[in-house]
């Protein structure tokens, strides 16, 4: 299918961006309390868009693995953002099959909590392993990446 590269890239993008985003959102919350209302609104908007994807139609159109791992990562991210925002962000996922695995990913993030590049890479690797995505990513040095490559 022509969508396969797009689905693959979206999962890899989510996997490699969420762990650093968690650290960044926590840092903003702690270091810039004046931005909390803006941050809360932005994360709530992000959650509303993500929750809209829980529809049966989208689930049917998307390869199972892609859909499931994406939802599990969403649950983890929004669970970790609840203390940041003071909002109940995981509510739409309560009756979904993604809650337990999402909670496990969130626990990995809490146990590893580091705010440096090595921590980001370690958490990405842990999430990839937990989600069965280790073979979907390959780490390269910057000088090994072709110009114009997104990931």
What residue spans do the PLM features occupy?
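Pan-zinc metallopeptidase signature
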Residues: 33-151
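A residue-identity detector for tryptophan
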Residues: 7, 13, 27, 127, ...
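An active-site-proximal "capping" alpha-helix that borders the catalytic cofactor pocket
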Residues: 14-32
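Post-HEXXH active-site segment of zinc metalloproteases
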Residues: 1-18
């Amino acid at each position: 299918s022509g969508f396969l590269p797009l689905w693959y890239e979206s999962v890899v993008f989510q996997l490699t961006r969420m762990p650093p985003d968690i650290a960044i959102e926590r840092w903003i919350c702690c270091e810039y309390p004046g931005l909390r209302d803006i941050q809360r609104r932005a994360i709530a908007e992000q959650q509303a868009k993500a929750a809209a994807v829980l529809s049966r139609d989208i689930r049917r159109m998307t390869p199972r693995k892609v859909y499931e791992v994406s939802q599990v990562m969403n649950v983890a991210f929004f669970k970790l953002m609840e203390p940041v925002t003071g909002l109940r962000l995981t509510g739409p996922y309560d009756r979904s099959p993604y809650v337990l695995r999402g909670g496990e990913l969130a626990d990995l993030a809490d146990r590893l909590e580091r705010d440096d590049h090595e921590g980001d890479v370690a958490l990405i690797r842990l999430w990839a392993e937990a989600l069965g995505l280790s073979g979907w990513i390959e780490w390269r040095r910057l000088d090994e990446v072709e110009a114009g490559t997104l990931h």
